Amino acid sequence: FECYERHFGHRPEHVCQNIVTAKENIPPHDLLVGGFPCQDYSIAKKGARGIEGKKGVLWWEINAILRAHKPRYVLLENVDRLIKSPAWQKGRDFSIILRCFYEAGYAVEWRVINAADYGEAQRRRRTFLFAFRNDTALFRKAAELICVEGLKGAHQLLLQDGFFAPIFPLYGFERKYSEGWLDEFRYLDLKDLSAAQSCHFYASGLMVNGRFYSVESIPLQFPYKPLCSVLETAPLAERYFLSAADIDHWRYLKGAKQETRHRRNGSTYFFSEGSMAFPDRSDLPARTMLTSEGSVSRSTHVVADPQTQRLRTLTPIECERLNGFPDDWTAGMPERLRYFTMGNALVVPLVKAMGKRISALAEDEQRS
């Protein structure tokens, strides 16, 4: 929060409080933007419980704000597994979210976007949801197209006339798709839906008037930025470099494993995982950064320093660059938190493009 205020200043409306108690103080607004915690949907966490998890339930606080204020537009973000959660009833959680939007009077378009596909230096896949109220011009256009053209109209929206296509163009679609209804004629209420609904959602999709259509999309790929494009070239502190004594441990962390391990209660289990590149290839975009970046862990990037060729971890500045932030955006906080912050962050150019798109929609709305 201090980092935010350092860049944007202090204002009375900047409230860093528990959303459960602070939501009553939220003023009227036209755009609701948020990202509810991802741990209960993430593949990085074992036993993730989805919308029922301790953090996944924060969706219901967003839903309460949605119903209380009825903003014209809503932009939300989460991990790519959101559309598949939970593992034992795939698509249930996302169906619940879509049904909530339907009941509140919104249509929704979603897209799973890999930042590297659109010219960024990180292979960071995230699910973005854009919801628009049923009295907006975009809603009327979507409803008319789907009513008249059916699935052909849905294709047109996803490929050309919807929210995401103008800023993140698609090459086309694969043959994988799903469609169905989430309205009260199919499921009496959320309890009924939660008990019975299971669906395979894909990377692109729409929900209008309770009907959803989802298809596996093929992005129109832009030239990507390789990891080497963000690496610092100035001499770096020794703490970033791997010592000779640590190399074997890093090789073990990154290597393939098939071994017997012991639980805390003394029982054993067989553990298996594949190998990772060591060091990371600098001619490709970086892997997805996690909040543990910079620590001694399997997921931490290790690169050959461009000046010395010695193996090292990424610096906080390099992590900022991977997300499109200016250098030293997080300066002033402990280094551990700088890595943690970037592991939680979005890729800025993607969000900036969405912001401009929303602004254009709002201007069109005023003219219509």
Region spans (language model):
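Redox-cofactor binding/interface segments in oxidoreductases and associated redox assembly factors
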Residues: 17, 33-34, 76, 291
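Class I S-adenosyl-L-methionine
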Residues: 22-29, 39-276
